Design a protein with these regions (language model features):
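Single, function-defining residue in the core of a domain
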Residues: 1-43, 83-84, 94-97, 108, ...
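Active-site- or DNA-interface-adjacent structural scaffold in DNA-acting proteins
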Residues: 39, 53-108, 167-168, 181
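Short, charged amphipathic recognition helices of the HTH superfamily
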Residues: 41-51
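Short glycine-rich loop/turn motifs
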Residues: 111-116
């Protein structure tokens, strides 16, 4: 119980420093309890979160489940209004940002969620901003929703931040290229092979016909895309060995090398493991198996997930930095076997029975990682 109280106190202090200027103290408390439940259960099912919270605090499950359920319906917690504070926390001191953008589907509830995630070094893209809608609302409005979310991201970022958007061919719209230019965002976006591309010398071919012999990459600096002649920094067309389909990439930076553009786009994939961590019932938190009738409830649930995942990932990073990951794997390979998120879950569960010297070292490293973000420094330097 003492360990649970300490965890809850830490989470509440952390969220107070993060959202205290926007949320009432009681709402911060409710949010903290729900995050504790998510971290303890590693699930996004409301009943499971409530049961884990009740077990951790020695309370009745019925009341804890109702508390979590009421939180998800609390209109006083407007995720859209919290994004500027959350984004500042998620990016920390970083100012050169690579952001992956993609839609993910929740077919059982007939809903879709647009996600803008920060590409990180550890293989999982960190959620920055998301927006859920009923699929029926997407007809004729999808581009408007994407523009709205990109504009919100721009508003929330420091003026000196440099952003590069990565997106797959579902976003290969020349109007989006122009809009990103208006926002002063860079981009590397894949587009379909049947779209016409005009080289700087005026020659026009379908994108698929610009791929070099044997699938080798070809870069067209200062190219124009589609019949609208949308100017981009460069187009790269490649069908390298091992690729299922050719990549036709529009890039804003015409000075970037062919390899740099290809490597940058390949990092877009890191949003997929994050979707799996959130949605998959076996390998993640199981959101795809949870019925959520209201998109606003889903967005609040995703906020709980984002906070819990970030804290658990930092905890996993702290343990790995101390070499604790060697005790999690049964082999002797040097590479990472468990993701930082998975490691964090394992360390979190082990805390109650962890030897005190190990626990102190882990917490010291964990605090050092969190203090890299100035937003939370005030909490952790008190006392």
């Amino acid at each position: 119980m003492r360990a649970t109280a300490q965890r809850l106190e830490f989470i509440q202090d952390y969220l107070t420093s993060l959202f205290g200027s926007e949320l009432h103290v009681k709402r911060v408390c409710s949010l903290s309890l729900a995050v504790l439940g998510v971290m303890t259960s590693a699930s996004l099912a409301v009943a499971v979160i409530g049961q884990a919270l009740a077990q951790a605090r020695g309370k009745a499950a019925k009341h804890a489940i109702k508390q979590v359920d009421r939180l998800l319906s609390n209109q006083g917690i407007d995720v859209w209004d919290l994004f500027p504070l959350w984004i500042q926390e998620a990016i920390g001191a970083s100012r050169d940002l690579v952001v992956a953008m993609d839609w993910t589907e929740f077919d059982a509830d007939d809903q879709s969620t647009l996600a803008l995630n920060l590409v990180t070094k550890h293989g999982r893209a960190q959620p920055l901003l998301w927006f859920s809608v009923f699929k029926a609302e997407l007809a004729g409005k999808r581009n408007d929703i994407e523009d709205m979310c990109l504009s919100r991201l721009k508003e929330a970022l420091p003026k000196e931040a440099k952003v590069t958007i990565l997106a797959d061919r579902g976003f290969g719209d020349v109007k989006l290229f122009g809009f990103l230019g208006e926002l002063d965002f860079g981009y590397v976006i894949r587009f379909r092979g049947d779209i016409f591309v005009t080289a700087a010398d005026g020659e026009t071919r379908r994108a698929e016909d610009w791929v070099g012999a044997g699938g080798r990459a070809r870069k067209l600096a200062g190219a124009e895309i589609s019949k609208e002649k949308q100017k981009v920094g460069a187009v790269v067309c490649v069908h390298a060995k091992g690729m299922k389909d050719a990549w036709h990439l529009a890039a804003s930076d015409g000075e970037a090398t062919t390899r740099a553009i290809i490597n940058l786009y390949s990092r877009r994939w890191s949003i997929e493991p994050e979707f799996r961590d959130t949605k998959d019932l076996r390998f993640g938190m199981g959101l795809s198996a949870v019925r959520v009738g209201d998109p606003y409830r889903r967005d609040r649930l995703l906020l709980l997930s984002a906070i819990a995942v970030m804290l658990l990932t930092l905890l996993g990073g702290a343990g790995e930095a101390l070499g604790m990951d060697r005790l999690l794997k049964s082999n002797t390979v040097k590479r990472r076997v468990h993701s930082l998120f998975c490691q964090g879950c394992l360390y979190y569960d082990a805390i109650p029975n962890m030897p005190e010297p190990t626990l102190l070292a882990l917490m010291e490293r964990f605090r050092a990682l969190i203090m890299e973000n100035s937003v939370t420094a005030a909490v952790l330097t008190v006392g």
